[in-house]
């Protein structure tokens, strides 16, 4: 037997947990070893809200999964709109080109954050992770017109207007 190359297998948090449980059930490892095989950061991902993996849904745009979790709410294009909606008991997703410290109150008020710019180290990503809120950044197909309070998905006829219900998945 010749081994040419080895590497650590990459897997989702759910897959790592499932594998550890099954290996323990089969007697291949102890319960203690099973617990040690699941990274605490991965376990944290499983504690955030998630969409049903078997559900039918249409993905209209993709970006970087900057902070785990799922969110559903009315699209809002300013921090102020997110705060007002939260005060009225409405759930929102804050949609911005990118966030700044001025958007913090809106980020706190919103269920999740969606940006067309930025990455995993952007303001939106770092703050959302710190708050435990879902965030998707760098959605290139999302062209935002904050003044008109709407966003278009490039390559489609989809236009998201303020108040439209949207969802985002910061886990996958």
At which residue positions do the language-model features occur?
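Long, charge-dense accessory insertions within large macromolecular proteins
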Residues: 26-28, 32-100, 112-113
């Amino acid at each position: 037997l010749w081994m040419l190359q080895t590497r650590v297998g990459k897997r989702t948090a759910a897959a790592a947990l499932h594998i550890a449980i099954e290996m323990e059930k089969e007697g291949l490892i102890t319960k203690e070893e099973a617990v040690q095989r699941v990274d605490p950061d991965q376990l944290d991902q499983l504690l955030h809200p998630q969409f049903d993996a078997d559900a039918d849904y249409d993905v209209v745009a993709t970006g970087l999964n900057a902070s785990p979790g799922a969110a559903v709410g009315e699209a809002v294009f300013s921090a102020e709109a997110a705060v007002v909606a939260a005060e009225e008991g409405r759930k929102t997703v804050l949609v911005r080109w990118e966030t700044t410290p001025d958007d913090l109150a809106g980020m706190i008020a919103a269920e999740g954050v969606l940006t067309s710019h930025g990455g995993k180290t952007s303001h939106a990503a770092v703050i959302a992770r710190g708050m435990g809120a879902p965030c998707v950044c760098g959605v290139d197909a999302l062209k935002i017109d904050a003044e008109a309070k709407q966003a278009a998905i490039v390559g489609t006829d989809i236009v998201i207007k303020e108040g439209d219900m949207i969802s985002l998945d910061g886990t996958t």
